Amino acid sequence: MKYCLLCLVVALSGCQTNDTIASCKGPIFPLNVGRWQPTPSDLQLRNSGGRYDGA
């Protein structure tokens, strides 16, 4: 019974925090924005590493 009461107190105390929810601002990938251009070999399926049967 003491263990259940302790778990209940810990769970309810976690609900009383006043911290704001973390949020991201800005672009998803802020490094090297607009500097990378794919080459034709980057766009071919055989270089993707997955299974490709050509069908």
Curated annotation (Swiss-Prot):
Record's superkingdom?
Bacteria
An example GO CC term for this entry is:
cell outer membrane
| One Pfam family in the UniProt entry | VirB7
Tell me the keywords, alphabetical order: Cell outer membrane, Crown gall tumor, Disulfide bond, Lipoprotein, Membrane, Palmitate, Plasmid, Signal, Virulence
At which residues is a lipid of type S-diacylglycerol cysteine covalently attached? C15
Q: How does it sit in the membrane?
A: Lipid-anchor
Q: What is its main location?
A: membrane
The membrane spanning regions, by residue number, are none
Give me the residues lipidated as N-palmitoyl cysteine: C15
Share any extra remarks.
Is protease-resistant.
Entry protein name: Outer membrane lipoprotein virB7
Q: Organism, per UniProt?
A: Rhizobium radiobacter (Agrobacterium tumefaciens)
The gene from which this protein is expressed is: virB7
